Amino acid sequence: MSSVVRTLHLGLNLHGAGGHSAAWRWPGTNPSAFFDIEHYVRAAKIAERGLLDAVFLADTPAISYDVTRQPPLNGLEPTLVLSVLARETTRIGLIATASTTYNEPYNLARRFLSLDVISGGRAAWNAVTTSSPATVANFGGRQIGREERYKRAEEFVETVRALWLSWGDETIIADQASGVYANTDHFRLLDPSKNAFAIRGPLTHPGSRQGYPIIVQAGGSDPGVRLAARSADVVFTAAGDLKTAIGESERLRALSRQFGRRATPLILPGLVTFIGGTEEEAQRRKKEIDALLDLTRAMDALARSMDVPVEKLSLDRPIPEELLPDPHNIAFSVGHHRTFEALAREGRTVREIIGSVQAFGHRLLVGAPEQIADSIESWFRTGAVDGFNIIPDVLEDGATAFVDLVVPILQSRGLFRTEYQGETLREHLGIPHHDVAAETLARPSSL
């Protein structure tokens, strides 16, 4: 029997005004929070006060829907936002999304390693592929198929990690007396003829106290799971029920072991929370926020997520089964699609699906603090998940409720830290400085 004590990990998703689509209309909320830097600073400080592992900022480099009745989800460039948060906080991890489809490895590697140094070793990169038509239109208009996207992603992640390691551990001498600053023999240069991007390196500066940033992945398709199993330290998932969560975690961990990983990735599904002093208060809060929802826009968003024609949908009827596409053929997130599809196959009406699921198909919890803590604990104790990426209904007051009311319960049960034990994100997550298998993948000789 293992003597290792598992530790619950919690992150906060900086989801614009909040996880609910109508959060921007909630009284007291800044409707333009998505590009208000002080909003993000306040949210990050709330998360750090609650001793959470990290804050997470998603990104789509496009306006992907009609903003006539809904503000964009996130607008500011993520690594710039997190650079500000790095100066306003001291311990909280800083995770940002950046696409492998519409970036170049050298620029991205440099940007995230700089963030890691500036923050004192608290940065992480959520590596995603991109296929949304709005984004494609901003980068030349050529749609890239899923297979090609993920092939590029695997090569991209390997190249970025190799660049992060390109300074080696003994390059800097910094001897003022002799005038020798560096021994360039220790540079770990890439062979341009052996990597897909013809990159040599090195980067313009060495790494941080945690070595290099944590790598996160969030794809639910077969190629996405493969990428996560091969390269990720942490995986963000969308699991609407425990059975799905268990199946997905078993699949990911088995594949990770096949790749020779010494440590399998941490699994953190998204969790949308509506918290009240009692269950009745929480239900009332959700009902009041739901009443602010633009159902026409919500139905359009659901149709896009499920890749079905919106004109074929009716609010008070189930989605016709013949309209449900093969998840392997859809352009959008497979994990989110599966959550919506499960509800559709239960015969739920479009209105019920919209009411049951917010924030792109993540699990939704409505209840008193004790109930939220109970559910988190029950999932964690199955071993299927290592924690959760918390998505409050309305970001600032929802995050405050989670930190002030739910976190103390988890602490009292011995599930969550009562103080930070380290200063870097690797220390918070318990991820070794070097994952031997992952580093082997990134070794310049293999590129």
Predicted regions and their residues:
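N-terminal beta1-alpha1-beta2 module of alpha/beta enzyme domains
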Residues: 1-88, 210-213, 323, 355, ...
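Internal, glycine-rich beta/alpha segment that forms the wall or movable "lid"
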Residues: 6-8, 104-226, 230-231, 259, ...
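Hydrophobic faces of well-ordered beta-strands that scaffold small-molecule active sites
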Residues: 8-12, 55-57, 92-98, 121-127, ...
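Conserved, mostly hydrophobic/aromatic
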Residues: 10, 47, 51, 85, ...
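Active-site mouth loops of central-metabolism enzymes
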Residues: 23-38, 97-106, 142, 147, ...
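Substrate-recognition/cap regions that form aromatic- and gly/pro-loop-enriched pockets
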Residues: 332-408
